[in-house]
Amino acid sequence: IFKSGIKTNSGETPGLEGAEFTIKLNSAVERAYSQGYTYAEVWNGIDENGNQVKVDSKRVQSAQAIAPSYAVIVTDKDGNAYTKNNLPYGKYIVKETKTPTDYETAVDFTFSITEDESEIKEIAKKTKHIVVNNEQLETYIKLIKRDLKTNKLVTLNSTTFEIKATKDIYDRATKKILFKKGETISQKIGNTTYTSFTTNADNIVVPDNSFNSKNDDKATITTPLKLPVGSYEITEIKVPSGFLQLEEAVKFEIKNVKDYETDKDGDFVKEVIIKNEQPTGTINLDKTISIRENVDTSLIDTSDLSGIEFKLSAKENIIDMSDGSVIYEKGQEIKKYNLTKDGKLEITNLPIGTYEIEETKTLNGLVLNTTKYEVKFEQKDLTTKVYTEKLDISNDTTLVEFSKTDITGDK
């Protein structure tokens, strides 16, 4: 048996090392099936697709007694495998029982020995040559965009990705370089060559030479063609609105393709998830007490301002840029906060948007500050993670006027 590892339309058939073939008499295999033994039991725990599956060892042993293996042969570095002994007359079935990693397993095939060896005079005719081709396994890449913190799918706005080779990508049969290290992966469909891939979304912007399909789920894009085994990385050339750029490329490797999920057509699909972060806002509030002149402060304890309370509300709808959902509705109270003992307040992890903060409680002897302070966070670039707004708020002491009245009611 000569075993080759081919790539579709490459025209090359170099030998493939390490493929194992098991040879059984076809009539014996059919007899085992007729007695109720399954395919995997007959082939020692290997199913029709070449996968190892769980089987009852006793039934396997019984099936092997009915349909024993006449030979188990393994291809050498040149792709050749030979039976050690001559096979007697008959029709045989051959199964590839071990396949080199990331090659498709060949389908079962049969051959016949139709002449008795003793009647064959020419030595060359005593060897039956069989060529078996294995297709190199490749996979589609499904890129999935998610929010780093919430893990939500980013469906509101599209993302555009590039895929690059992080090492030279070879045709494993011919050893020819398909993509050089650092090269951007391009895929040609018809007359168009695509060099990037754009996710489906509610709002889609597709750059020139970028592939997009309305048939893909939102927040995803699947490459139109398969990629070969190798090492790759993903970068973003268009970041979705409301998100930060990736801090580093997302690396992935294509290997052990048979472990990947398959689509409805049985093609392998490798999922790669890319997560980005949304910027946030932080409010730093510093509270001071303004002491009026000629005011008795003996009843005012300014050593502990933790009794002062503030309320934070949304001044507009606060939107989650992952999917466009409303996090806080306009006018909605978000939370009430008390100051620290020394009059400070820090509110963190606020989604980008516009807020109002107002004082709702103060200390005895202080005037309640009724001003509503607007705090607005706007994303200005793709790298700033936290936008900080500082508020310095002051309270006046209460001014109380006392009057004295005599017993007659006169002042």
Placement of each model-derived feature along the sequence:
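Solvent-exposed loop/turn and edge beta-strand elements of beta-rich ligand-binding domains
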Residues: 1-411
